[in-house]
């Protein structure tokens, strides 16, 4: 009996030691484990922050789920490792190192990355930024070095970078398909963040959506959609090509028919379409061409969300005009030479005076004679691409941004802030035409403070500018006022019905009235931006 008692006591002791070790292990790694509504995940705890790479937010949209709305995940039992980034969504990425994913490309791509402060707990209530990457709705990924959000996490903000289906897989609209699968992916990611970010230490009542380029265009669409509104309460739109407009059903259907012909399927035969490989899909997508005429600007985004009257009820710029956008604090901005990369990619040879005038007449069939004196062609024998770039920058980005900002100030109660980024980085650019220019996307490595990961060597003034930009964004995400919280060099005044103020982002930051007495934007306003804001 004594021997049996001793044995039992020893056994209990061993069990207790084992259990204690297990509890100790859980305690020591607790910061790396977060329990979501679908199961536990394990991330990485760095010295200054935590990061969870490749967190799934929907079932993989493959096989029978290709061209279907995103579907909720199935729960899992064991702790799922989220230690490495996942593939970018199906695409032929041409954005260069640090912007194209080194992991590869896959249709199984509905994942997101979460960056949090190191000390975040479920009680922290840190503000949240959800970042929607750009890339003309055809390329791009949130899981790349450019969007590394370490600096934001170190500044007490949680950042979630998302992926969504691109190109024809995300935005093919037909009589049977609404064409907003990639947009619904974004909404599914926002829903996931809203439902789960509290477990990471975030405040679901303080979620800011932010996007650049097509990501900013997406932000504008979310501001019109009743499907999105409950999942965020502030917005940042960086370099949105609002004038291009989202696709109407007719244009979307035409692009879909050309794609189906290229891939060898009837547009209504989903079995055939789903039977094609990813590479076959991408090859056929690449061959989809556009006719010129008044649709020339659609070349900027061959594939995009579709105005279906339900998920997206109207063009974002029309919603702005009618005061039908979500009334939330908003930052709107752009860079100085947005259109140069597009113009010099589309027109690789010099554009002469006659060709330039034809292009202006195509884009502005009713207003060309009013536009040409403001944007005169270069003398005969010289290249008119520089002035064409200025015109398209103003028409697609700068002037509709002005319209958006001023109209918000008149129609909405929430504050709107405007910025214009003009700093020429000391590091080079991959496109020769962008040397000594501020091209589309060039600001992002400063906005994210990811310049070292991008191999850029900035001088001290530029590093200080990056910190100042970080502080403005952190303050806005935290308080909805970019001036309250972390130190900023200049008070960024909101635009009101009586005050036009733009924050000029240069190594010496200042504010200016860039809206009043602008004859170019005044003239472009009268084109009604492709009839999106006609009186």
Curated annotation (Swiss-Prot):
Gene Ontology CC entries for this record: cell cortex; esterosome membrane
Active-site feature positions: 213 (acyl-ester intermediate), 338 (charge relay system), 440 (charge relay system)
Domain of life the protein comes from: Eukaryota
GO molecular function: carboxylic ester hydrolase activity
Record-linked SUPFAM superfamilies: alpha/beta-Hydrolases
Glycosylation: residue positions: 500
Keywords: cAMP, Cytoplasmic vesicle, Disulfide bond, Glycoprotein, Hydrolase, Membrane, Serine esterase, Signal
Gene3D superfamilies, alphabetized: alpha/beta hydrolase
Induction: Expression is strongly stimulated by periodic pulses of cAMP.
Main location: membrane
Places the protein is found: Cytoplasmic vesicle, Esterosome membrane
Leader sequence segment: 1-20
Disulfide-bond pairs as recorded: 89-109, 265-272
Protein family membership: Belongs to the type-B carboxylesterase/lipase family.
Name used for this protein in its record: cAMP-regulated D2 protein
Organism from which the protein derives: Dictyostelium discoideum (Social amoeba)
Name of the gene this protein is made from: D2
